[in-house]
Amino acid sequence: MIDREQIVRIVSDYLSTGETFLVEVAIHPGNRILVELDSAQGVCIDECVALSRHIESQVDRDLEDYELEVGSTGLTSPLKVMRQWENCIDSELSVLLTNGMKETGRLITVAPEAIKLEVVRMVKPEGAKRKKPETQELTIVMADIKQAVRII
């Protein structure tokens, strides 16, 4: 069985000097290795090919055969690591909470323990007949977030 930690080390060492960063390494049955990358500017195919070749040069296919797939996370893929959150500041997000509620708004700040979203709520001012849009800041604890994706 291919060691996930070995792949993480190889990828992390390779990416340590650039803007591209590791999001996830998954090893599926049949030694199918999936490596997901991301970057503020996006990940080009040349970076994926170069990293794939680097991994193949470090992991001996003769000892144990494997299938390797290196790619970028999609624009609408869920956010998984802190650097992805940081790259999404000032972007619109859809955040699904663990209680089933969904919040949509512009990401203002992010910290390891919580995020702050700017959301628009329809509020009825006192004495008014209709609701009017009102911008509010909403703090959401990371532990309460089930999934968050960018809105394009």
Swiss-Prot record:
Domain of life: Bacteria
Alphabetical UniProt keywords: Cytoplasm, Ribosome biogenesis
Biological processes per GO annotation: ribosomal small subunit assembly; translation
Subcellular location: Cytoplasm
GO terms under cellular component: cytosol
Positions of disulphide bridges: none
Stored SUPFAM superfamilies: YhbC-like, N-terminal domain
Sequence intervals crossing the membrane: none
InterPro entries, per database record: Ribosome_maturation_RimP, RimP_N, RimP_N_sf
UniProt keyword Acyltransferase present: no
Its biological purpose: Required for maturation of 30S ribosomal subunits.
Family designation: Belongs to the RimP family.
Record-linked PANTHER family: RIBOSOME MATURATION FACTOR RIMP
Annotated protein name in UniProt: Ribosome maturation factor RimP
Protein source organism: Porphyromonas gingivalis (strain ATCC 33277 / DSM 20709 / CIP 103683 / JCM 12257 / NCTC 11834 / 2561)
Lineage: Bacteria, Pseudomonadati, Bacteroidota, Bacteroidia, Bacteroidales
Gene symbol of the encoding locus: rimP
